[in-house]
Amino acid sequence: MDKSESPNASRTSRRRRPRRGSRSASGADAGLRALTQQMLKLNKTLAIGRPTLNHPTFVGSASCKPGYTFTSITLKPPEIEKGSYFGRRLSLPDSVTDYDKKLVSRIQIRINPLPKFDSTVWVTVRKVPSSSDLSVATISAMFGDGNSPVLVYQYTASGVQANNKLLYDLSEMRADIGDMRKYAVLVYSKDDKLEEDEIVLHVDVEHQRIPISRMLPT
């Protein structure tokens, strides 16, 4: 070794130089991994957001029709005396009613029994003219005329019955979102007083898709 060459310089010259293009390849791999992760998150988000009426709280339901989605609202009936009735009109969010001409194909009611449930209830959904009230006499007549399906849900020895949903088809009626304020959920407490903390009703309104703003996941 030449005395003029320092030991440090000699060690530096023996260091392995990086191959040409390795830095750019590494950067590309990192970018690809980041893009893959973003796509996985996006796919997961889209999978969650796909419309379906398959809820875990009821049995035998179906997916939404092509081009349709659904909006859910929750109703909690008040205390209902034995042999008495309760009714409440459907009230969808403003973000949905802004598209009042979008067609509605089906209404689905799901009964979610709470731990204290030990009663028998009849549940239905009916079109009620805006001029009509929801008095006990009016609701009683609607349950008896046979013009809409009625779900009879009751406490059983095993706890609660498996079938806890009612599907009301509006396809032939050409109903739209604007018509939903004319529909009401009706409840009849048959055998005893229904307490406030016995059931919750989930109402799924299946309607044509409406424009919504979505953001990519971060």
UniProtKB/Swiss-Prot annotation:
Principal location: virion
Regions of compositional bias (Basic residues) in chain numbering: 12-22
Entries under InterPro entries matching the protein: Cucumovirus_coat (IPR000247), Cucumovirus_coat_Asu_sf (IPR037137)
Cystine bridges: none
This protein's UniProt keywords: Acetylation, Capsid protein, Ribonucleoprotein, RNA-binding, T=3 icosahedral capsid protein, Viral nucleoprotein, Virion
Molecular function (Gene Ontology), one example: RNA binding
Sites of N-acetylmethionine modification: M1
GO cellular component: ribonucleoprotein complex; T=3 icosahedral viral capsid; viral nucleocapsid
Location in or out of the cell: Virion
Superkingdom: Viruses
Region of interest (Disordered), ranges: 1-30
Purpose: Capsid protein. Probably binds RNA and plays a role in packaging.
Domain notes per entry: The N-terminal arginine-rich stretch does not seem to be the major RNA-binding region that allows formation of an infectious ribonucleoprotein complex.
Family of this protein: Belongs to the cucumovirus capsid protein family.
Record-given protein name: Capsid protein
Source taxonomy: Viruses, Riboviria, Orthornavirae, Kitrinoviricota, Alsuviricetes
